[in-house]
């Protein structure tokens, strides 16, 4: 029997939950098996920024995980998930991952990704950045994690906030090797 490996999407308490929402919808559209984890603070920000209840996003996932539940399957390297995306990623979460501090199920699952050499994609959403933020990003990158900052391009002429968020969602799917058409690709013929 073939196991279809899941991609974990975690949303933490930074502004920019639209990035997590658009990534979730893109993964669903691509037919990917999705495990979703939303922190308590992210739940409040979803209500504020998106004007929806977090349950509306949870309905799109195949499985939901609680960040405070250390007994969840994704806390083990034997769990057959293939990648994890944290979008948006707070600086606190980044720091915990960079320093091997698995304080909850979310940071433990990220730790599993790094130790098992699975894809870990962090979408930090903070500006400006302190030196320690940059150092933590470098640490995660050196461990094999992918830092994909929420810095959308503008060559595709975004007409909405959703277009800008889809640019980042498309880049996340790109690094995971999932084909997508979430934004117009640069051809060099546009100038």
UniProtKB/Swiss-Prot annotation:
Domain of life: Archaea
GO molecular function terms listed in the Swiss-Prot or TrEMBL record: carboxy-lyase activity; flavin prenyltransferase activity
Enzyme class: transferase
Name of a matching Pfam family: Flavoprotein
EC numbers on record: 2.5.1.129
Binding site for FMN: 13-15, 39, 90-93, 125
Catalyzed reactions per annotation: dimethylallyl phosphate + FMNH2 = prenylated FMNH2 + phosphate
Family per similarity comment: Belongs to the UbiX/PAD1 family.
Database matches in HAMAP family: ubiX_pad
Name of the molecule in the record: Flavin prenyltransferase UbiX
Organism expressing this protein natively: Methanothermobacter thermautotrophicus (strain ATCC 29096 / DSM 1053 / JCM 10044 / NBRC 100330 / Delta H)
């Amino acid at each position: 029997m073939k196991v279809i490996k899941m991609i974990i999407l975690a949303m933490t308490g930074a502004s920019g939950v639209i990035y997590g929402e658009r990534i979730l919808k893109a993964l669903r559209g691509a037919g990917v098996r999705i495990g979703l984890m939303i922190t308590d603070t992210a739940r409040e920000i979803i209500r504020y920024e998106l004007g929806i209840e977090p349950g509306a996003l949870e309905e799109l996932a195949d499985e939901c995980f609680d960040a405070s539940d250390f007994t969840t399957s994704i806390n083990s390297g034997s769990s057959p998930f293939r990648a994890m995306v944290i979008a948006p990623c707070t600086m606190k979460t980044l720091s915990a991952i960079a320093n091997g501090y698995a304080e909850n199920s979310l940071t433990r699952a990220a730790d599993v990704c790094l130790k098992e050499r699975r894809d870990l994609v962090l979408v930090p959403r903070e500006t400006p950045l302190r030196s320690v933020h940059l150092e933590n990003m470098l640490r995660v990158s050196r461990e094999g994690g992918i830092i994909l900052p929420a810095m959308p391009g503008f060559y595709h002429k975004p007409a909405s906030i959703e277009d800008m968020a889809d640019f980042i969602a498309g880049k996340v799917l790109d690094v995971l090797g999932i084909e997508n058409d979430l934004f117009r690709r640069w051809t060099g013929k546009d100038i």
